[in-house]
């Protein structure tokens, strides 16, 4: 799943192909994984160079910047730049209010932010989808029948329920900007950081009856309330790539289920494990699959 989602985002966001695509595939995953771990610990006062994890991360960043520079050169030399729809090309054509373009470092920073936020999280959600479906064979049968009939209504509801029960980002942060904020009996001062638990909200029985039960049918009859279902966060800070991620997951799962048979499993549910940016199945959501009769059986 990581390779599939990485390829999708590299092409859609970076406009990468050929050797640049392969170089980014090699450089970005270890760099992002290392960076997400380093973000949780203080930077040391001494610079140990390439012998330290910070030195290795800086080397990853230099390699990444060089590849993005080449992608920018390629895009600027493309006579069809104004018709391209990848995010890199759109950034190159955008202008600030004063008419100035984005600088190359700014573009590189924006691209890595979009990738770091949207690659691993989508892959982790897809892994949870496989983990859940192989443990719910009746739902799996219904899903395949629904897809074969030309509908993906149940698939959409299933993705919503997977994101409710297995949110890959468990908390979201906000900071008080007003002079004070009243929440119930508490008065929070300006500058106070608030941590909201996505997992606790999604497990609230008053919001989702039988919350511990994995039941996609709950979303067949109603759309999720954006104040209650928040795997992408909420408000003006809601994930900018939410629609893209949802579409990507629907396409990948539809392709998988139409072309492969997933073997049911009676194994215990997999535990949550941090994989850097996102929380994923502890055993990697391993599954046995075989091609469906008459399918092309190609994915990834």
Language-model regions: role of each:
Residues 1-124:
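Cytochrome P450 heme-thiolate monooxygenase catalytic core
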Residues 149-184, 205:
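Conserved cytochrome P450 K-helix E-x-x-R motif and the immediately C-terminal K′/meander segment
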Residues 196-223:
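Conserved cytochrome P450 K-helix/beta-meander segment immediately N-terminal to the heme-binding cysteine loop
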Residues 5, 119-146, 242-260:
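Cytochrome P450 catalytic-core helices
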Residues 26-30, 149-150, 238, 243-300:
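Cytochrome P450 proximal C-terminal region
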Residues 53, 57, 66, 158-164, ...:
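C-terminal domain-closing interface element
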